[in-house]
Amino acid sequence: SCCARNPACRHNHPCV
């Protein structure tokens, strides 16, 4: 799973 709309989470779960 990724965090498309959460900048704080994107570095952990980037959407590729």
UniProtKB/Swiss-Prot annotation:
<dbReference type="GO" id="GO:0099106">
    <property type="term" value="F:ion channel regulator activity"/>
</dbReference>
<keyword id="KW-0629">Postsynaptic neurotoxin</keyword>
<comment type="similarity">
    <text>Belongs to the conotoxin A superfamily.</text>
</comment>
<keyword id="KW-0008">Acetylcholine receptor inhibiting toxin</keyword>
<dbReference type="GO" id="GO:0030550">
    <property type="term" value="F:acetylcholine receptor inhibitor activity"/>
</dbReference>
<feature type="site" description="Important for the structural rigidity of the globular toxin, which impacts ability to inhibit alpha-7/CHRNA7 nAChR">
    <location>
        <position position="5"/>
    </location>
</feature>
<dbReference type="GO" id="GO:0005576">
    <property type="term" value="C:extracellular region"/>
</dbReference>
<keyword id="KW-0528">Neurotoxin</keyword>
<keyword id="KW-0872">Ion channel impairing toxin</keyword>
<feature type="disulfide bond" description="In AusIA-globular form; alternate">
    <location>
        <begin position="3"/>
        <end position="15"/>
    </location>
</feature>
<feature type="disulfide bond" description="In AusIA-globular form; alternate">
    <location>
        <begin position="2"/>
        <end position="9"/>
    </location>
</feature>
<dbReference type="GO" id="GO:0090729">
    <property type="term" value="F:toxin activity"/>
</dbReference>
<comment type="function">
    <text>Alpha-conotoxins act on postsynaptic membranes, they bind to the nicotinic acetylcholine receptors (nAChR) and thus inhibit them. This peptide has been experimentally synthesized as AusIA-globular and AusIA-ribbon. Both forms are active on chicken alpha-7/CHRNA7 nAChR with similar potency (micromolar range).</text>
</comment>
<keyword id="KW-0800">Toxin</keyword>
<protein>
    <recommendedName>
        <fullName>Alpha-conotoxin AusIA</fullName>
    </recommendedName>
</protein>
<feature type="disulfide bond" description="In AusIA-ribbon form; alternate">
    <location>
        <begin position="3"/>
        <end position="9"/>
    </location>
</feature>
<feature type="site" description="Important for the structural rigidity of the globular toxin, which impacts ability to inhibit alpha-7/CHRNA7 nAChR">
    <location>
        <position position="4"/>
    </location>
</feature>
<feature type="disulfide bond" description="In AusIA-ribbon form; alternate">
    <location>
        <begin position="2"/>
        <end position="15"/>
    </location>
</feature>
<keyword id="KW-1015">Disulfide bond</keyword>
<keyword id="KW-0964">Secreted</keyword>
<dbReference type="GO" id="GO:0035792">
    <property type="term" value="C:host cell postsynaptic membrane"/>
</dbReference>
